[in-house]
Amino acid sequence: MQLYTYLYLLVPLVTFHLILGTGTLDHGGALTERRSTDATALKPEPVLQKSAARSTDDNGKDRLTQMKRILKKRGKNARGDEEYSKFIEREREAGRLDLSKFP
């Protein structure tokens, strides 16, 4: 009879202690916020795809791809011949160009 009395008092106490102490149920479901945030912190972060990591311009186009196309079109020149002559002309008109340094 005494054994049943102790078990009657001990079983709810042990169950209550296990639930609050571990913070989980039988299947690993989180009961407390503290345990759920710890579990979230252990999850790996998603890896960014290349397209998500690249910046885009106002039209939503990929800047890196656009720059590659422009450079491929220009060839080995830093600027195309037309761009270079327009740049020289603008600088001459603005008076910021020293004519002795450029042809």
Curated annotation (Swiss-Prot):
Chain residue ranges for the region called Disordered: 34-64
Tissues/organs with expression: Expressed by the venom duct.
UniProt xrefs under InterPro entries: Conantokin_CS
Record localization: Secreted
Signal peptide: 1-21
Keyword Mitochondrion: no
Residues spanning the membrane: none
Binding-site list for a divalent metal cation: E89, E93
Chief site of localization: secreted
Cofactors required: Ca(2+); Mg(2+)
Keywords: Calcium, Gamma-carboxyglutamic acid, Ion channel impairing toxin, Ionotropic glutamate receptor inhibitor, Magnesium, Metal-binding, Neurotoxin, Postsynaptic neurotoxin, Secreted, Signal, Toxin
MF GO annotations: ion channel regulator activity; metal ion binding; toxin activity
Cellular component GO terms, alphabetical: extracellular region; host cell postsynaptic membrane
Entry note: cofactor: Divalent cations stabilize the toxin the in alpha-helix conformation.
Residue positions where 4-carboxyglutamate is found in the record: E82, E83, E89, E93
Residues the UniProt record annotates as site (Significant for the subtype selectivity between NR2B/GRIN2B and NR2D/GRIN2D (similar potency for both of them)): Y84
Residues excised as propeptide: 22-79
Compositionally biased tracts (Basic and acidic residues): 55-64
Role played: Conantokins inhibit N-methyl-D-aspartate (NMDA) receptors. This toxin inhibits NR2 subunits N-methyl-D-aspartate (NMDA) receptor-mediated calcium influx in central nervous system neurons in the following order of preference: NR2B/GRIN2B (IC(50)=0.14 uM), NR2D/GRIN2D (IC(50)=0.31 uM), NR2A/GRIN2A (IC(50)=0.68 uM) and NR2C/GRIN2A (IC(50)=4.9 uM), when tested on rat receptors.
Other facts noted in the record for this chain: The mature peptide does not contain cysteine residue.
Family (UniProt): Belongs to the conotoxin B superfamily.
Protein name as catalogued: Conantokin-Br
Protein species of origin: Conus sulcatus
